[in-house]
């Protein structure tokens, strides 16, 4: 009950503050106000409770996930309209059949529990990532494997969750991210994934075909011919086609001894 009253108070306070502003002030302060309200709400909720839900009590702990993008025309949730199941590895133990989503703006794994209702809304929890080493999203025609990269000597990118697309002699990962853009007083979160490949010592972001081919050194001509033969255009290539290129390169390396 206390939890409900605090959340109700916070939203009432935000509505009162908004009503006292002029339209121009609301547009100008939109982002700052949203950030402030979310910060205050999370601080209160974090100090009150951690979620603990039945069989998943070890995994489902974190803070209340507030849909901060309510003023946006899009959702920074990865493939949110597609049905999926999910699993994750928490403290080296695997948990299956979890209702998970991934926030591409905050980089958080979101758990949705239809049995937890607060303020007439289904509760969502932003899971603590400290003990999550991996989570998988299973779509109808695709499986996405995410690994949390942290404190790894050979990893030269920002720590966080990356989709592991290929993990052979070559490495191929994707950082699924959204950025915040303001336009006409509205917040937008355009989705802009970044692809990285490691052929030698470090991960390099794929930017252009020329730069991509240079990664393969003296095999670049063979890779170019393979791409022409398979009619692969890098700008339009999906992750499966890029994986095929990497596998072809690995076969060349094996044949060369």
Sequence positions of predicted segments:
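Sec/Tat signal peptide C-region and signal peptidase I cleavage site
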Residues: 15-19
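Aromatic-patch recognition
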Residues: 67-70, 77-210
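General N-terminal leader/first-domain-start detector
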Residues: 20-94
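Positively charged n-region of N-terminal signal peptides that target proteins for export
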Residues: 1-4, 20
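Long, compositionally biased interface segments
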Residues: 210, 214-257
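Sec-dependent N-terminal signal peptides
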Residues: 4-13
